[in-house]
Swiss-Prot record:
GO terms for biological process: glycine decarboxylation via glycine cleavage system. Belongs to the GcvT family. Pfam families: GCV_T (PF01571), GCV_T_C (PF08669). The keyword Isomerase does not apply. Its EC number is 2.1.2.10. Disulfide bonds: none annotated. It comes from Yersinia pestis. It is an enzyme of class 2 (transferase). This is Aminomethyltransferase. Gene3D superfamilies: Aminomethyltransferase beta-barrel domains, Aminomethyltransferase fragment, Probable tRNA modification gtpase trme, domain 1. The glycine cleavage system is composed of four proteins: P, T, L and H. The gene is gcvT.
Length: 365
C-alpha cells in the first residue's frame, strides 16, 4: 500500500487528484496544472516534498567520506550552511542519484536525496560510511515543503519570528540554516527564488495552513515537472540513471576534477569517458503544433552528412512559453536543427542548451 505524507488530508481538502508516485500518494494537481504552474512563475506556490529523504551524517571523518562518495567536492564547502549539487556515482560512472549536500559543521553534513532511490541510496551510503565511522541518521521525523516563486520568500517571512527572519536575511542561493524548529534552505526545483523548509512532522499541517492563509497556493507533481523542465533541471530516471554518465546528462559541471589526487567513486570510469567522448543532453524547441514527448526519436545530420539518432528524455508543452520543449540525449555533433518523429510526421525542432526559462522569463528566444 502506498505511503502518505503528513499532509495527505490537507491535499484532499484542497481538492487534489492523488496518484501513486514511487510508492507515495502524492498530489498530481489541485484542479489545474497550468494554473499552478503560472502561479509559481508569477507569485508563490508550495509543494509537499516530504516523500524525499533527508539524511544527516555525523563524525570526525564526514568530510573525508563525502569527498570519496560524491563526484562534486565538499572541500568547496567552507562556510557553514553552504550547499552544493552533485551526483553520487557507481564504479562504472553511472548516476546512483543526484542530491544536495549541506555543510553544517565539521562533523555534521546533511543530504537530501530522491524518494524513488531511497532504499538503494541508503544502502550505498551506509555501506561506504562504515569504514569512515560516519553515523548515518535518516530524518523520517521531518517533513519538507518547497515554497517557490517571486513572492515566495516575502510570504514565508510573514510566518517567521523576528529571530528567524534575521537568521535568513540576505541568505544567498544554495544555503541552509537551522533556525528554531525550521531548517530553511534557498534551494528549489523550479528556476524561481524560494525556500525548501524542513520541520518536525507534527508541525507541518499548521505550517501548511499558515502558508495557505498567506496566499501561497498548493501545486502538484504535474506543475513541478513542467517547471523543472522549463528550468532545464534533470529528473532522475529520465535524464540520468545508473547506466548514464553525468557527462551525458549535462552534469559535467558537477564533477570536481581538481585536485587530481582526490579519488572518488566512479572517477576512473569518468576519466575514460571524458577521453572517449559521450553523448550530450540538449534542449529542443518546437514552435509548431504538437507536443514533444518522452522517448520520441531525434534525428540530425552531422557536418559530414551522416545521420544520427538520439532520444527525448523529458518533453512537454511549456505553459510559460506557449510551445513544446524537451530535453534530449543525442550523439555529439548535433547542430542547431534536428527533426523529431511524431507519429508519421517529421517535425522540425531547434536545438538549444538545456534551460528555457529563468526567473519567469524566457531565455531561449
Amino acid at each position: 500500500m502506498a505511503k502518505q505524507t503528513p499532509l495527505y488530508d490537507q491535499h484532499v481538502a484542497c481538492g487534489a487528484r492523488m496518484v501513486d508516485f514511487h510508492g507515495w500518494m502524492m498530489p498530481l494537481h489541485y484542479g489545474s496544472q497550468i494554473d499552478e504552474h503560472h502561479f509559481v512563475r508569477q507569485d508563490a506556490g508550495m509543494f509537499d516534498v516530504s516523500h524525499m529523504t533527508i539524511v544527516d551524517l555525523h563524525g570526525n571523518r564526514t568530510r573525508e567520506f563525502l569527498r570519496y562518495l560524491l563526484a562534486n567536492d565538499v572541500a568547496k564547502l567552507t562556510q557553514p550552511g553552504k550547499a552544493l549539487y552533485t551526483g553520487m556515482l557507481n564504479e562504472s560512472g553511472g548516476v546512483i542519484d543526484d542530491l544536495i549536500v549541506y555543510f553544517l559543521s565539521e562533523d555534521y553534513f546533511r543530504l537530501v536525496v530522491n524518494s524513488a532511490t531511497r532504499d538503494k541510496d541508503l544502502a550505498w551510503i551506509s555501506q561506504h560510511a562504515e569504514p569512515y565511522q560516519v553515523e548515518v541518521t535518516v530524518r523520517d521525523d521531518l517533513a519538507l515543503i518547497a515554497v517557490q516563486g517571486p513572492q515566495a520568500q516575502q510570504k514565508v517571512a510573514t510566518l517567521l519570528t523576528t529571530e528567524q527572519q534575521q537568521a535568513i536575511a540576505g541568505m544567498k542561493p544554495f544555503f541552509g540554516i537551522q533556525t528554531g524548529d525550521l531548517f530553511i534552505a534557498t534551494t528549489g526545483y523550479t528556476g524561481e527564488a524560494g525556500y525548501e523548509i524542513a520541520l518536525p512532522k507534527q508541525q507541518v499541517v499548521a505550517f501548511w495552513q499558515q502558508l495557505l492563509a498567506a496566499g501561497v497556493k498548493p501545486a502538484g507533481l504535474g506543475a513541478r515537472d513542467t517547471l523543472r523542465l522549463e528550468a532545464g533541471m534533470n529528473l532522475y530516471g529520465q535524464e540520468m540513471d545508473e547506466k548514464t554518465s553525468p557527462l551525458a546528462a549535462n552534469m559535467g559541471w558537477t564533477v570536481a576534477w581538481q585536485p587530481e589526487d582526490r579519488q572518488f567513486i566512479g572517477r576512473a570510469a569518468l576519466e575514460r569517458q571524458r577521453m572517449k567522448g559521450t553523448e550530450q543532453l540538449v534542449g529542443l524547441i518546437m514552435t509548431e503544433k504538437g507536443v514533444l514527448r518522452n522517448e520520441l526519436p531525434v534525428y540530425f545530420f552531422d557536418a559530414a552528412g551522416n545521420q544520427h539518432v538520439g532520444v527525448i528524455t523529458s518533453g512537454s508543452f511549456s505553459p510559460t512559453l506557449g510551445f513544446s520543449i524537451a530535453l534530449a540525449r543525442v550523439p555529439a555533433g548535433i547542430g542547431e536543427h534536428a527533426v523529431v518523429q511524431i507519429r508519421n510526421r517529421e517535425m522540425p525542432v531547434r536545438v538549444t542548451k538545456p534551460g528555457f526559462v529563468r526567473a519567469g522569463k524566457a531565455i531561449v528566444l
